[in-house]
Amino acid sequence: MEQNYTKIDHELPLIPLRGLAIFPYMILNFDIGREISLKALDQAMMDEELIFLTSQKEAEVDEPGEEDFYHVGTICKVKQMIKLPGDTVRVLVEGVSRGRVKKIEQEDGYFRAVIEEIVFDSDNLDSETEVEIEAFVRNVFDAFEEYINIGNRVSPEILISLADIEDVDRFIDTIAANIYLKSSQKQEILEEFDIRKRLELIYSILLEEIDILKIEKKITLRVKKQMNKVQKEYYLREQLKAIQKELGEEEDINSEADEYREKLKKIKAPKTTKEKIEKEIDKFSKISSMSPDVSVSRNYLDTIFSLPWNKETKDKLDITKAKDILDEDHYGLEKVKERILEYLAIRTLAKSLKGPIICLVGPPGTGKTSIVKSIARALNRKFVRISLGGVRDEAEIRGHRRTYVGSIPGRIINGVKEAQTKNPVFLFDEIDKMAADYKGDPASAMLEVLDPEQNKDFVDHYLEIPFDLSKILFVTTANSLGNIPRPLLDRMEVIEVSGYIEEEKLNIAKKYLLPKQIKEHALKENFIKIDDETLRSIINHYTREAGVRTLERTIGKICRKVAKKYVEDPTLEEVVINKSDLETYLGKDMFKYQLAEVNPQIGLVNGLAWTEVGGVTLEVEVNVLKGKGEIVLTGKLGDVMKESAKTGISYIRSIVDKFDIDPEFYKTNDIHIHIPEGAVPKDGPSAGITMALAVISALTKRPVPGNIAMTGEITLRGRVLAVGGVKEKLLAAHRAGITKVLIPKECEADLDEIPENVKEKMEFVLVEHMDEVLEQALLKSGENNEN
């Protein structure tokens, strides 16, 4: 029945409203703050004070496009405009008539549209339709009257003015403006241009609202009957308040309790949790304000309501941007970055995915802690760091029970409270440094925290109610897995963060450390210039580490001296530091890189070892002396290493015939095995083949090439078994100038971790038996190393 409407075109400014809708003849005031709306309002005031108002589909959109708002709205006249503080304007408008957007364009920073004004024309109705509409109008009027009588929400006086309205469209709009409507219902009424359907729509909404009001009334009556006891309690509480006031007790416990009850309504928590909190509030309301228990109860409730029960940050699921952020902050660490990007990809597909629990293991200074900060930034999550180094008390994790004086929640709950979100990135730093004592074992408490199946109902001893930790992304760091209990390690996905090679350190120094230190020392960008050769010299002669922490401090030392020089001479434009200048800035070389012996040696073999700060080369020296068959082991060797040496000698006794060794050598000779740097403790089985080869070399007087190193455990039958830390050991061999390394065949997969530029400069020989080691490394007497 759109033919019963007159249509007139207007060109008007358009304002999209957020969460509001206006009907013709309705007066409404609202605040405008967006620039696009302010410009449209200014234009309307310059024209005929007419403006077109329509509703946004989604109120959250700050910069709407044409597709973000409805195309049917209301032409309005601006009645009043008041400027408020902070670039906000309060506007009073009156609806004139409905309109529909025919054409829209955005010019000069606001929307301008051709609006088709649509006005109902009752003259075109036939007599039958008029009768039907009149019947509808009466039904709607009666329903609206019943709505007013039941609800007591609208003044009955409106019925008088409604009875005088002859325009059916205005009749509908007036009712719509005075009843409770959802946003979708308001828009549906605005967009309906069939007068009969429009009457049907408002009538059905009124009947539905009447049914709801009747049910509300029943509920209200039922509740009032149950209120007698509550009113009695309220009366007694009011009397108690008066008594407390007379006694000078100013704190109004009950008003605080009421505030807590209001807060309880707003949190999203399981029913049992809310019931427990409600009991605590009731208990709090009955405590005298003079009682010492009141502060304990208040602190507990404040802690509960300060937790982010409902708050959660929205993840940025843009893999490309996340990769850019991770690459921007860190060089290398590809395994860690790849795992986070995989998690992001799966989160994009499965929104309910639980966060992985990752353990980053590697030497100090390799970027484990800082990469976790970058992970939080890439995911758009809050970051919380908890250091577990030296933690001995289980209560540090789970909190103290409230029976103790001064009890507080554990570090987990405090971290969540600090983050004010249910899904931060949580870093447990130095998880391998926890220890147990008589107060409990914190590692056992961590079992629940780091178990995705259990941590959704984590119970802190202080709170004594479950709190969901399942949406947190937990990352732990450690220098060694050896000190982490097996059940705890089993819950984590271990990613090894290896030490950096020289080339990686060079890139990190150039791209990250030097610019960072220049900025921290308030120097101009590129004020200090250090070439690659000089940086390599700093790396090799002033630091000895798997990470880059000492390297950063060393560069910082240079920056301090340059800053002093600049203050003394402000005319300096830049400072260029060459290799020859290092002694001036840093002093004499701190480390002389002990490159491998060039010439073959008898009884001297290069071994490889792994430490918590990375791989190192280890010289094994053997002397065979006339004696009584004693085996002397020096160099502060551990029990496993001593047993490994004895295993090697037993193996040698089984092969004396192959090398023309005196079968009684172990009776007539003392064998002295020494590993230099005697103050440093050494242990483990990985020097087994190294010690065995050194003893054979000393017994046979056959040299071993100085450019060869090796690692591997030996058995009594001469088999070579796998060892750990292969990547770190091979990088240490590369730093020492070794060109050939023997490793167990079982460790072949570890070669995939070795950078290509290292592989190009070194030869890796995979061995399964000691025979292969002897063939590769034992020269004939007087033979020189051909390599």
From Swiss-Prot:
Family (UniProt): Belongs to the peptidase S16 family.
Residues given in the record as ATP binding sites: G362, P363, P364, G365, T366, G367, K368, T369
Stimuli inducing this protein: By heat shock.
Compartment(s) of residence: Cytoplasm
Primary localisation category: cytoplasm
Every Lon proteolytic domain range: 599-780
Active site: S686, K729
Domain (Lon N-terminal) ranges: 12-210
GO cellular component, one term: cytoplasm
Stated name of the protein: Lon protease
Organism expressing this protein natively: Clostridioides difficile (strain 630)
Catalytic activity, reaction form: Hydrolysis of proteins in presence of ATP
SMART domains referenced in this protein's UniProt entry, alphabetically: AAA (SM00382), LON (SM00464)
Record Pfam families: AAA, Lon_C, Lon_lid, LON_substr_bdg
GO molecular function, one term: ATP-dependent peptidase activity
Gene3D superfamilies attached to this UniProt entry: 1.10.8.60, 1.20.5.5270, 1.20.58.1480, 3.30.230.10, LON domain-like, P-loop containing nucleotide triphosphate hydrolases
Keyword terms: ATP-binding, Cytoplasm, Hydrolase, Nucleotide-binding, Protease, Serine protease, Stress response
Summary of subunit composition and partner proteins: Homohexamer. Organized in a ring with a central cavity.
EC number(s) reported in the record: 3.4.21.53
GO biological process: cellular response to heat; protein quality control for misfolded or incompletely synthesized proteins
